[in-house]
Amino acid sequence: MPLSANSNLLQIPLIKDLVSFLVAIRDRELNSIRKHYGLNMQISEMLDYEQPSKYIVSETEYLNNKEFTPVLTANKAFILGYTDEPFNIYDKGECIILDDFTLDCKLVNFAFKVKSSAIKILTPKNDILLRYVYEYLNFLNLETTEHKRHYISEIEPMLIAYPDSNENVITFCDLMDKFDKKIEIENKYLQSLLSQKNYLLSNMFI
């Protein structure tokens, strides 16, 4: 398919719009749940946490090869690079990584290592759906201006709304998953266009 000059530009607003729409839907649904159920469950009842010490990467220079283990941070960068260290890799399944100082968090469903001890690794207790808690934490827009650890003293005691029926939670999480998949498809399409553009430009004057 021929590329028009504006193909990539058209994709970027679409992705931004999808993300904004996802956030709006999430906030609407969680506000409705909170209004109906009230603040009825503590984070400490829902999540276990693990210190990341054993999963901290030894090397400070990372690789670009995606075949190796990603090194993660909870901030916007998320994947800092990759390591070929074959030991002490977190591979216990889905978790939330939360920066104890900035309160940034990410939902992770692949094996990884981390950069620093500032991370808390959070996993669900019993039949709690982790995706729901992750979305709720983002819904709260957690922010801090204090350089200290927050999770144990402030986040764990926090009350949030959690439906009595897991069916309602599953419906909410499924909705979030559908938006994620749509955004992922559009992102892949954008990357494909960029690769095609770069290829054409590199061969234009050969």
Model-inferred region functions:
Residues K16-A77, I185-S195:
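Non-catalytic DNA-recognition/assembly elements of restriction-modification systems
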Residues M1-N31, K35, L159-L201:
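Amphipathic alpha-helical segments
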Residues N203-I206:
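Short hydrophobic/aromatic patches at helix-to-coil boundaries
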Residues Q42-P163:
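DNA target-recognition domains and sequence-specific DNA-contacting regions of bacterial/archaeal
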